[in-house]
């Protein structure tokens, strides 16, 4: 005999113009698609959503009255719609509401509903798990915040494949992140083609999440993600000045002190040919500033060797930059022509063996730098996230290591741990890529 679970029921009040009605229909459709019941009665509802209007004074008064009635009759009220975008008028008048959003915020409203009235997951009837269908292990997930790119790097054809920058609404991004955290994900890896440009196309528009305004900009997005209480790691960060704004968040422990910035080269001539920003001198100054603000910061980057026109002098400048910057993690690629890329028009391609030899030499230089940096961690205690547990042992990662591209922490001994567990470990050895540690 099976015990039938009570279906969560949502009361709904919609005021205002046809555009408000359209927003209401989107919310109602999502509620029904997820299995929530809709009720015209306050009494039979587990909570009530009031879709408001704020166009004229009479509409504001009507909306505030409707919110008050819902609070009196039910007690659990979510407010959405135009009135929610007019400052703090709702919270000031009715501080007991659960949350407030602006208009066209269906996904944000659903996230709030999930928080206050989660629908029990039924593996027999629900086609999709709460966190969505994922290809990654259960304890970490990639969170794409935008699509496309506005740059015209000569070695890249991404803009022609994926189009210009299109940022996801911040409420949608945060709702997905919240679902992931609720499903047990311990680490979110923020990705896009150009993470630091997030929100540029939206003109940094303010949206609502959890009843609070959030600007569609990287700093504010990171602050909101930090409230989830899990690891947040930034990837594919273009070296804009705005990146400086997130470094204090790393210093405060709100997001991981990890920055993946693809510098690509250090020679001014080659950077110009690539149509990449900055110069080696300016970049070194910024790295020094980042480390001054957040001494624990880990900087990962990628470089291209053998780009068309790269001379021995250009390559020497790149090697000198590596030795000066002392980056923590580096990946390198020998230049390979891409059909449709403008770099194909820059001149004769360097011989393949030259391109590959330079890549190998760069990585050898970086191995020595990495070995010194990792050796400095011996005898320190660090936090790690367990990735794998089998009969051969336990493999984890530190805050300095992204999955698949960085190093690992191999744990000595046998103990009770599962993937997704956080552990405190003491580093006992290191090589140029990985750490070896014991649980403390």
UniProtKB/Swiss-Prot annotation:
<comment type="function">
    <text>Catalyzes the methylthiolation of an aspartic acid residue of ribosomal protein uS12.</text>
</comment>
<feature type="binding site">
    <location>
        <position position="153"/>
    </location>
    <ligand>
        <name>[4Fe-4S] cluster 2</name>
    </ligand>
</feature>
<dbReference type="InterPro" id="IPR005840">
    <property type="entry name" value="Ribosomal_uS12_MeSTrfase_RimO"/>
</dbReference>
<dbReference type="InterPro" id="IPR013848">
    <property type="entry name" value="Methylthiotransferase_N"/>
</dbReference>
<dbReference type="InterPro" id="IPR020612">
    <property type="entry name" value="Methylthiotransferase_CS"/>
</dbReference>
<feature type="domain" description="TRAM">
    <location>
        <begin position="375"/>
        <end position="440"/>
    </location>
</feature>
<dbReference type="InterPro" id="IPR023404">
    <property type="entry name" value="rSAM_horseshoe"/>
</dbReference>
<dbReference type="Pfam" id="PF00919">
    <property type="entry name" value="UPF0004"/>
</dbReference>
<protein>
    <recommendedName>
        <fullName>Ribosomal protein uS12 methylthiotransferase RimO</fullName>
        <ecNumber>2.8.4.4</ecNumber>
    </recommendedName>
</protein>
<dbReference type="Pfam" id="PF04055">
    <property type="entry name" value="Radical_SAM"/>
</dbReference>
<dbReference type="GO" id="GO:0005829">
    <property type="term" value="C:cytosol"/>
</dbReference>
<dbReference type="GO" id="GO:0006400">
    <property type="term" value="P:tRNA modification"/>
</dbReference>
<feature type="binding site">
    <location>
        <position position="17"/>
    </location>
    <ligand>
        <name>[4Fe-4S] cluster 1</name>
    </ligand>
</feature>
<dbReference type="InterPro" id="IPR038135">
    <property type="entry name" value="Methylthiotransferase_N_sf"/>
</dbReference>
<dbReference type="InterPro" id="IPR006638">
    <property type="entry name" value="Elp3/MiaA/NifB-like_rSAM"/>
</dbReference>
<dbReference type="GO" id="GO:0035599">
    <property type="term" value="F:aspartic acid methylthiotransferase activity"/>
</dbReference>
<keyword id="KW-0479">Metal-binding</keyword>
<feature type="binding site">
    <location>
        <position position="149"/>
    </location>
    <ligand>
        <name>[4Fe-4S] cluster 2</name>
    </ligand>
</feature>
<feature type="binding site">
    <location>
        <position position="156"/>
    </location>
    <ligand>
        <name>[4Fe-4S] cluster 2</name>
    </ligand>
</feature>
<keyword id="KW-0408">Iron</keyword>
<dbReference type="GO" id="GO:0051539">
    <property type="term" value="F:4 iron, 4 sulfur cluster binding"/>
</dbReference>
<dbReference type="InterPro" id="IPR005839">
    <property type="entry name" value="Methylthiotransferase"/>
</dbReference>
<dbReference type="GO" id="GO:0103039">
    <property type="term" value="F:protein methylthiotransferase activity"/>
</dbReference>
<keyword id="KW-0004">4Fe-4S</keyword>
<dbReference type="InterPro" id="IPR007197">
    <property type="entry name" value="rSAM"/>
</dbReference>
<comment type="similarity">
    <text>Belongs to the methylthiotransferase family. RimO subfamily.</text>
</comment>
<feature type="binding site">
    <location>
        <position position="82"/>
    </location>
    <ligand>
        <name>[4Fe-4S] cluster 1</name>
    </ligand>
</feature>
<feature type="domain" description="MTTase N-terminal">
    <location>
        <begin position="8"/>
        <end position="118"/>
    </location>
</feature>
<keyword id="KW-0411">Iron-sulfur</keyword>
<feature type="domain" description="Radical SAM core">
    <location>
        <begin position="135"/>
        <end position="372"/>
    </location>
</feature>
<keyword id="KW-0963">Cytoplasm</keyword>
<keyword id="KW-0949">S-adenosyl-L-methionine</keyword>
<dbReference type="Pfam" id="PF18693">
    <property type="entry name" value="TRAM_2"/>
</dbReference>
<keyword id="KW-0808">Transferase</keyword>
<dbReference type="InterPro" id="IPR012340">
    <property type="entry name" value="NA-bd_OB-fold"/>
</dbReference>
<dbReference type="InterPro" id="IPR002792">
    <property type="entry name" value="TRAM_dom"/>
</dbReference>
<feature type="binding site">
    <location>
        <position position="53"/>
    </location>
    <ligand>
        <name>[4Fe-4S] cluster 1</name>
    </ligand>
</feature>
<dbReference type="GO" id="GO:0046872">
    <property type="term" value="F:metal ion binding"/>
</dbReference>
């Amino acid at each position: 005999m099976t015990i039938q679970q009570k279906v969560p029921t949502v009361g709904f009040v919609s005021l205002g113009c046809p555009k408000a009605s359209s927003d209401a229909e989107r919310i109602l459709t999502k509620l029904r698609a997820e299995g929530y019941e809709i009720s015209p009665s306050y009494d039979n509802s587990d909570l009530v959503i009031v879709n408001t209007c704020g166009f004229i004074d009479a509409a504001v008064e009507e909306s505030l009255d409707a919110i008050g009635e819902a609070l009196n009759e039910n007690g659990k009220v979510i407010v959405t719609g135009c009135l929610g975008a007019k400052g703090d008028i709702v919270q000031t008048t009715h501080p007991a509401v659960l949350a407030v959003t602006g208009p066209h915020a269906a996904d944000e409203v659903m996230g709030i509903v999930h928080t206050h009235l989660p629908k029990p997951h039924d593996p027999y009837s629900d086609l999709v798990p709460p966190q969505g269908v994922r290809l990654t292990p259960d304890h970490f997930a990639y969170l794409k915040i935008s699509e496309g790119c506005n740059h015209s790097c000569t070695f890249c054809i991404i803009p022609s494949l994926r189009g210009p920058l299109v940022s996801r609404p911040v409420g949608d991004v945060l709702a997905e992140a919240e679902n992931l955290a609720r499903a047990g994900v311990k680490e979110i890896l923020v990705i896009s083609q150009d993470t630091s440009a997030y929100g540029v196309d939206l003109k940094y528009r303010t949206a609502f999440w959890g009843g609070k305004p959030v600007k569609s900009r990287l700093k504010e997005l990171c602050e909101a993600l930090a409230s989830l209480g899990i690891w947040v790691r930034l990837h594919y960060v273009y070296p804009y000045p705005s990146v400086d704004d997130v470094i204090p968040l790393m210093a405060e422990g709100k997001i991981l002190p990890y920055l993946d910035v693809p510098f690509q080269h250090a020679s001014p001539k080659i950077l110009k040919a690539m149509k990449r920003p900055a110069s080696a001198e300016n970049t070194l100054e910024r790295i020094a500033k980042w480390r001054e603000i957040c001494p624990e910061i880990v900087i990962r980057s990628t470089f291209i060797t053998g780009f068309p026109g790269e001379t021995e002098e250009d390559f020497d400048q790149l090697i000198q930059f590596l030795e000066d910057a002392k980056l923590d993690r580096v990946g390198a690629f020998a230049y390979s022509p891409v059909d449709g890329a403008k770099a194909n028009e820059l001149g004769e391609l360097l011989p393949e063996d030259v391109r590959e030899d330079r890549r190998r030499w760069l990585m050898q230089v970086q191995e020595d730098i990495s070995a010194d940096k990792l050796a400095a961690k011996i005898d320190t205690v660090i936090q790690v996230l367990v990735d794998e547990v089998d009969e051969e042992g336990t493999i984890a990662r530190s805050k300095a290591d992204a999955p698949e591209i960085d190093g690992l922490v191999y744990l000595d001994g046998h103990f009770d741990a599962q993937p997704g567990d956080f552990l405190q470990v003491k580093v006992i050895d290191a090589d140029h890529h990985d750490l070896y540690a014991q649980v403390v």
